[in-house]
């Protein structure tokens, strides 16, 4: 039987009622599509309104830069003339492709970009009109052509100017070294062409092949067959490897000799024992004798004392 308390604990509980909310809350969140779509459309409009003249100037500057890189000018003035168009090109690209957020009126920004491209174009034209030109190997005066005239033979590479530095050839010679020149005649000719035409260097290059030959001969001597050491023959054992050495051989003795030996050993032992006994006896006798002598002396002394007292 369940008590009243157990019935309250295990009985069915009534459901708890929660009151409903009376007020209503309306949340108004701005939509993301309305903010993203206009910005994308504005970017497309700005790209469509870019001027065509600026793209033409950019193509001209890029072609000139490629020709300058192919020709490879050596003088300082020519290097300065090639660096300035590249600077104008960098200014143009930075003004055309500026990844900044669109703020304010888009039409005003496109007008400012047009003004910047016009200024860059005027600066490039004035720079080439003052007498600067593109470096070329076939030009009549100083290896420079005015702007606008193409190179007559752009595919043929120019000969090395004496003022230019031959750093790639020197670097190759330093890496290879004099002792590691190629062995074939064709490769030797190529190596001689790469070396600079100086008398001291030519003398050192002529003396380098015997050194290389000596170096190779040393390598061949070292790479010869190794010395073979003479192996000593193994020790010939008189018994099998599994078994141990044979026992030591004793001298052959007859039984009579064995008996004689045993008897002599016994006699020696007896003699030793007798010697010990005799020593003991002698010691005892000596003691007794000493004692007897002492007693006799004492008696004499006593008798002498008694005789003297009687008198």
UniProtKB/Swiss-Prot annotation:
It comes from the Eukaryota. Residues 78-97 have a biased composition (Polar residues). Residues 48-99, 186-229, 291-311 are annotated as: Disordered. Residues 48-61 have a biased composition (Basic and acidic residues). Pfam families: POM121. Residues 213-222, 291-305 have a biased composition (Basic residues). Belongs to the UPF0607 family. This is Putative UPF0607 protein ENSP00000382826. It comes from Homo sapiens. The lineage of its organism: Eukaryota, Metazoa, Chordata, Craniata, Vertebrata.
